[in-house]
Regions:
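Long, contiguous binding/interaction regions
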Residues: 1-52, 56-82
Length: 82
């Protein structure tokens, strides 16, 4: 059964990318353009081939959350979102 989230809600999700220098700026640009002030942390894989980003922010609606997730998944090098 799908958990019903009441918005606004603080949501945390993780994204994984192939290593690239432009990902930090692209994620920040997506969040800022939509008025989201959140926390973004980055961790490098052991061999340095991948970057994982943990994003925590308050989202006003599921539509906004889906819009941001869609935009982030369109960044070059995107592998998955959890």
């Amino acid at each position: 059964m799908k958990k019903i989230i009441e918005y606004p809600a603080e949501i945390t999700f993780k994204t994984i990318f192939s290593r690239s220098d432009d990902i930090d700026a692209a994620i920040d640009e997506i969040l800022i353009a939509r008025g989201i002030a959140g926390s973004v942390t980055c961790a490098e894989s052991r061999n340095g081939k991948f970057l994982s980003y943990t994003i925590t922010a308050e989202f006003e609606s599921e539509t906004l959350l889906q819009n941001i997730c869609g935009a982030i998944s369109s960044i070059t090098g995107f592998i998955m979102m959890l």
